[in-house]
Curated annotation (Swiss-Prot):
Designated name of the protein: Small ribosomal subunit protein uS9
Protein family per UniProt: Belongs to the universal ribosomal protein uS9 family.
Biological-process GO terms, alphabetical: translation
PROSITE patterns: RIBOSOMAL_S9 (PS00360)
Compositionally biased intervals (Basic and acidic residues): 27-38
Annotated GO MF terms: RNA binding; structural constituent of ribosome
Superkingdom field: Bacteria
Annotated region (Disordered), positions in chain: 1-38
Organism for this UniProt entry: Rhodospirillum centenum (strain ATCC 51521 / SW)
One Gene Ontology cellular component annotation held by this UniProt entry: cytosolic small ribosomal subunit
Organism lineage string: Bacteria, Pseudomonadati, Pseudomonadota, Alphaproteobacteria, Rhodospirillales
Assigned keywords, A-Z: Ribonucleoprotein, Ribosomal protein
């Protein structure tokens, strides 16, 4: 009998292939020897290396507590955003090292790294984090300074006479 073709993806696969988007087995979590998920997050010039494991919700940044390293509540809320979106608040311990950039960029890198590590630990959380835009690396960086100008776009003061 002829196989029914319902989409362009089915046509590309050829005969006897499994339909697109359907996998037989669920994805396995990517864990190290100690049972932690590792990921890196980036934002502007900041790079965060993140390890997560099940625990009480403690977050350690560069050997210091989250509240000590990030004093502004907005930054702490930004870092905890991945956990609140997938309803996993106070279920994972996070240990991370952050370098480069300023505090805002570091918080963004940390949020990106935590989101990626959560998807490695629980692959089922990926659609929710992807829909919230937390798995996408923010490509916005500082525009470079051009010669003949004061800054990236600001010109030197012009005098007619």
């Amino acid at each position: 009998m002829a196989q029914t073709i319902t989409s362009l993806a089915d046509l590309k696969q050829g005969p006897g292939a499994e339909p697109a988007g359907l996998s037989a087995e669920p994805q396995e979590p990517k864990l190290d020897k100690e049972g932690r998920a590792y990921a890196t997050g980036k934002r502007k010039d900041a790079v965060a290396r993140v390890w997560i494991k099940p625990g009480s919700g403690k977050i350690i940044v560069n050997g210091r507590d989250l509240g000590v390293y990030f004093a502004r509540p907005v930054l702490r809320m930004m870092i905890n955003q991945p956990f609140s979106i997938v309803a996993r608040v106070d279920q994972y311990d996070v240990m991370c090292t952050v370098s480069g950039g300023g505090l805002s960029g570091q918080a963004g890198a940390l949020r990106h790294g935590i989101s990626k590590a959560l998807t490695y630990y629980e692959p089922a959380l990926r659609p929710a984090l992807k829909a919230a835009g937390l798995l996408t690396r923010d490509p916005r960086v500082v525009e470079r300074k051009k010669y003949g100008r004061a800054k990236a776009r600001r010109s030197f003061q012009f005098s007619k006479r």
